[in-house]
């Protein structure tokens, strides 16, 4: 997680603050929110996920939400498409650390599966 945070911080500093027109240059769609933490239905379920086609490809619905944020600068989903800037990155990362702790507490089975995959590989 620390490497991921450092990468985001480096990106924010490379891109810098919004330019004179105030438009955000770098948006973050990886934060913990209702899209990125959508519950996975049981394997034998016929229920389709709204935001994901599979684990690494977002659905067209998520893609349209991204485009809406990029074009309007406004997100209807909390913490989706944050503007990463040198002046705001620390607050975003602190919020994300707390959100991750909360997600882990709500999803112990998913956390155990992820940890197992990280230790033993796919």
Whereabouts are the PLM-identified features?
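Extracellular glycan-modifying ectodomains
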Residues: 1-122
């Amino acid at each position: 997680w620390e490497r991921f945070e450092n990468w985001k911080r480096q990106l924010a500093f490379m891109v810098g603050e919004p330019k004179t027109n105030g438009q955000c240059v770098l948006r973050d769609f990886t934060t913990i929110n209702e899209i990125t933490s959508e519950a996975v239905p049981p394997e034998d379920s016929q229920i389709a996920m709204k935001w994901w086609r599979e684990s690494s490809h977002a659905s067209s619905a998520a893609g349209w939400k991204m485009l809406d944020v990029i074009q309007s600068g406004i997100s209807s989903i909390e913490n989706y498409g944050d503007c990463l800037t040198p002046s705001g990155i620390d607050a975003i990362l602190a919020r994300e650390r707390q959100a991750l702790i909360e997600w882990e507490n709500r999803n112990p089975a998913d956390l155990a599966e992820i940890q197992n995959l990280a230790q033993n590989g796919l």
